[in-house]
Curated annotation (Swiss-Prot):
Entry keyword annotation includes Cell inner membrane: no
Any one of the GO BP annotations: cell adhesion
An example Gene Ontology CC term for this record: extracellular region
UniProt keyword Magnesium present: no
Subcellular location: Cell surface; Secreted, Cell wall; Fimbrium
Family: Belongs to the chaplin family. Short chaplin subfamily.
Domain Chaplin: 41-81
Endpoints of the signal sequence: 1-27
Protein name (database record): Chaplin-E
A Pfam match: ChpA-C
Effect of deleting the gene: Essential, it cannot be disrupted individually in a wild-type strain; the lethal effects of its disruption are suppressed by loss of some other chaplins, the roldet protein (RdlA and RdlB) or by inactivation of the tat secretion pathway. Quintuple knockout chpA-chpB-chpC-chpD-chpH has strongly delayed aerial hyphae formation, makes many fewer aerial hyphae but no effect on viability of the spores produced. Further deletion of chpE leads to more severe effects, and on rich media few aerial hyphae are produced after prolonged growth.
Length: 82
């Protein structure tokens, strides 16, 4: 039972981190950007900076579940990647 609680807690934390990362990734305009600077970093290895811009287009427009789809308020919505 203790292992089940621990696994559930780890799963919830991982899911929260994934959701937070997805929220931050969707907040950028115009695709992926990687602009970083290592300024004012004294020391031998303290100014290292590695960034990887990743753009994954995902459409989540009008997603809902209904028995009668015509009466669905999301019926006819259009989602397009530019």
């Amino acid at each position: 039972m203790k292992n089940l609680k621990k696994a559930a807690a780890v799963t919830m934390v991982a899911g929260g981190l994934i959701a937070a990362g997805a929220g931050m990734a969707s907040a950028t305009d115009g695709g992926a950007h990687a602009h970083g600077k290592a300024v004012g970093s004294p020391g031998v290895a303290s100014g290292n900076l590695v960034q990887a811009p990743i753009h994954i287009p995902v459409n989540a427009v009008g997603n809902s579940v209904n028995v009668i789809g015509v009466l669905n308020p999301a019926f006819g919505n259009l989602g397009v990647n530019h």
